A protein has these predicted regions:
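Conserved core of the sugar-phosphate nucleotidyltransferase
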Residues: 111-203
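N-terminal Rossmann NAD(P)H-binding glycine-rich loop of SDR-like oxidoreductase domains
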Residues: 14, 255, 263
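Rossmann-fold cofactor-recognition segment
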Residues: 77, 278-290, 296
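Conserved glycine-rich Rossmann-like NAD(P)H-binding loop of the short-chain dehydrogenase/reductase
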Residues: 50-51, 270-283
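Conserved N-terminal Rossmann-fold NAD(P)-binding element of oxidoreductases
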Residues: 11, 249-253, 276
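Conserved N-terminal catalytic core of the sugar/cofactor nucleotidyltransferase
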Residues: 34-99, 181-182
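N-terminal glycine-rich phosphate-binding loop and ensuing alpha1 helix
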Residues: 2-59
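NAD(P)H cofactor-binding loop motif with strongest signal on the N-terminal glycine-rich segment
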Residues: 30, 107, 254
Length: 296
């Protein structure tokens, strides 16, 4: 079986956020951003080796981080370049000629899950190129100046994340073709394959909202909250709803959707249910006073 090698892309400079410190060195949940994905890929049994592509001015810093982290799978620290594709090319050239898969991941996506890594590695046993995506939730427009030119069908649109994974020979050939194009311009590695090796289909693996990228300062608060949610251990659910028979339950948002379904299941289990919602009881769950009044 072809080995899966993870490439952590940590070549950013922090300029997009207007900062002098690269974002991969920001701290969240007690660690630098770059440490979290290294931890995740280190733990995954499907990953054989990890290489980190660093901003050339911070290679020594990255070496110190690796020494302190004690990760056994980190074998190389490579120098990136000015553009994102320069970092990808550094890894491709470092492993050129080897029969391996490369799994590229942004250092500033600290919440990549084991489920995503597992699914990507599983797909690599059948496919030569993989992207991780989520459905578009907002309406996307194509602008013509300061007017709407067209509105694509949202059901066909996906938001790209990482990891993006490839058989090395595929991504290497795609970049060889791309670099011969004087108008070469893409934003990620899957874009290179789609444009320059259209004969290779790119398989889609479902992503996760938590697998977000640090792009703006405000993102740090969202990412920190995702870490808090991930770290919260929920109590084990009862084997059946029989344990709730004769109990009393309060359900906020119980007039429709998931809340309505929960109310129905509780009623069926013999639970005494009090359902509150703005549309039925005038309860505003965003107001402490309104919630307190409902519970009196």
């Amino acid at each position: 079986m072809r080995p899966n090698l993870t490439i952590i892309l940590a070549g950013g400079s922090g300029s997009r956020l207007g900062l002098s410190t690269p974002t991969q060195f920001f701290k969240v949940a007690g660690k630098m951003f770059v440490e979290h994905p290294i931890d995740a890929f280190e733990r995954n049994p499907h990953i054989s080796e990890i290489a980190i592509v660093s901003n050339p001015f911070y290679v020594a810093d990255m070496e110190n981080i690796v020494l302190q982290g004690g990760w056994k799978k980190v074998k190389r620290i490579l120098k990136g370049g000015k553009e994102r594709y320069d970092s990808s090319l550094a890894a491709i050239r470092a492993y050129s000629g080897q029969d391996v898969n490369l799994v590229f991941h942004d250092a500033v996506r600290p919440l990549v899950s084991q489920r995503i890594i597992d699914d990507v590695c599983d797909a690599l046993t059948r496919c030569e190129a993989i992207d991780v995506t989520l459905p578009a939730v907002d309406t996307i427009i194509c602008a013509e100046g300061d007017h709407i030119g067209s509105i694509p069908d949202r059901s066909l649109l996906q938001r790209g994340q990482t990891p993006q994974a490839f058989r090395l020979s595929v991504i290497e050939t795609a970049y060889e073709r791309a670099l011969k194009d004087p108008d070469f311009k893409v934003t990620d590695d899957c874009g290179v394959v789609v444009k320059y090796m259209p004969e290779v289909p790119v398989f889609l693996v479902p992503g996760e909202e938590a697998n977000m990228k640090l792009t703006y300062k405000e993102d740090t608060y969202l990412i920190d909250k995702f870490f808090q949610l991930r770290g919260s251990e929920l109590p084990a659910a009862p084997a059946s709803l029989d344990a709730l028979r004769g109990k009393v339950a309060a359900v906020f948002g119980g007039s429709y959707g998931i809340g309505h379904d929960i109310v129905a299941q509780l009623y069926a289990a013999g639970t005494r249910v009090h359902a509150f919602a703005r549309s039925t009881t005038g309860t505003d769950v965003g107001s402490r006073e309104s919630v307190a009044e409902a519970l009196q």
